Amino acid sequence: MRKMLAAVSRVLAGSAQKPASRVLVASRNFANDATFEIKKCDLHRLEEGPPVTTVLTREDGLKYYRMMQTVRRMELKADQLYKQKIIRGFCHLCDGQEACCVGLEAGINPTDHLITAYRAHGFTFTRGLPVRAILAELTGRRGGCAKGKGGSMHMYAKNFYGGNGIVGAQVPLGAGIALACKYNGKDEVCLTLYGDGAANQGQIFEAYNMAALWKLPCIFICENNRYGMGTSVERAAASTDYYKRGDFIPGLRVDGMDILCVREATKFAAAYCRSGKGPILMELQTYRYHGHSMSDPGVSYRTREEIQEVRSKSDPIMLLKDRMVNSNLASVEELKEIDVEVRKEIEDAAQFATADPEPPLEELGYHIYSSDPPFEVRGANQWIKFKSVS
């Protein structure tokens, strides 16, 4: 009897040491999956589009929620570090657009390719890099994903080609990556992203033409967040139907604030490209909460009420959270635990990003040429002047 009482006492003591929320979550029976209706995509030159219902598993839902929260908290931490003058130079944040980067990744394979513009932090994370490598890149430290020399606009990961600072210039490169996929006979696609502000550039239409002519497996994706810097789409474009801009290329207009819509549309587009039909165009209707960059307060060309309305009615994280809680895929307590874990991860990454050393001046020319300096050009050593003083 004494042994039995002692065993019961140990079990109860172990339960008492666990947070009450964890005990509650562990004892609750959750649904394994749930079916949701999603918004129908507008179509251009397509008879059928993505499905209007989709199944979300509990496992995927928790993964998507954690990833979107991580991107959101990472961007808010970057905002804080910038205001503390720890991050310097250009910095473009994507909070509000989390459903785009997470949803696109959910619809493709790790071996597929992605290239985007300068609002790239979220995509760098979803392509597989840890938060500490992203924040360290923002602070210019050696542990950054580009050794601290790329900064906000020039981040890279496996099968992720940046992060490009020239508006629209990544689009022809994306078509070139798709050409390589076809040339090498690989069943891969390239997601080529640009914003509504770049959508009027001539080089994009040239890329459309070559991709269609050669039937390249390229998904052209316009992230329409309504404003190109401080100019609304209505003031910048004769037509704001960006999904029709490819003319002879089929297109989809997608709710970019709903991760499930983005995921299903991406799966559809990827399957279209893999079938050998050529390129397809997607317009993701989304919204950024911050200004264009850190030098833009974001309220001179739009009202605070407009931003708050989007936050209250269309926030991508809240939409996923409500779906999961209401369908018994997760509990509020469980999602709060994820929030706590994400905040700790971000804080740890921020500490690393501020404590990690900066790259020495001698490495300024590294990773530019096939061989690292010092080497002579026309008989002169151009690198001898780059010496650290400490």
Curated annotation (Swiss-Prot):
Keyword entries, A-Z: Acetylation, Carbohydrate metabolism, Glucose metabolism, Magnesium, Metal-binding, Mitochondrion, Oxidoreductase, Phosphoprotein, Pyruvate, Thiamine pyrophosphate, Transit peptide, Tricarboxylic acid cycle
Protein's cellular compartments: Mitochondrion matrix
Any one GO MF annotation of this record: metal ion binding
GO biological process: glucose metabolic process; pyruvate decarboxylation to acetyl-CoA; tricarboxylic acid cycle
Binding site for pyruvate: H92, Y118, R119, A157, G165, V167, D196, G197, A198, N225, Y227
Signal sequence interval, chain numbering: none
Positions carrying Phosphoserine: S232, S293, S295, S300
A cellular component term, taken from the record's GO annotations: catalytic complex
Residues that bear Phosphotyrosine: Y301
CDD domains found in the cross-reference section: TPP_E1_PDC_ADC_BCADC
Primary role: The pyruvate dehydrogenase complex catalyzes the overall conversion of pyruvate to acetyl-CoA and CO(2), and thereby links the glycolytic pathway to the tricarboxylic cycle.
Protein known as: Pyruvate dehydrogenase E1 component subunit alpha, somatic form, mitochondrial
Organism from which the protein derives: Mus musculus
Highest classification ranks of the organism: Eukaryota, Metazoa, Chordata, Craniata, Vertebrata
Record gene name: Pdha1
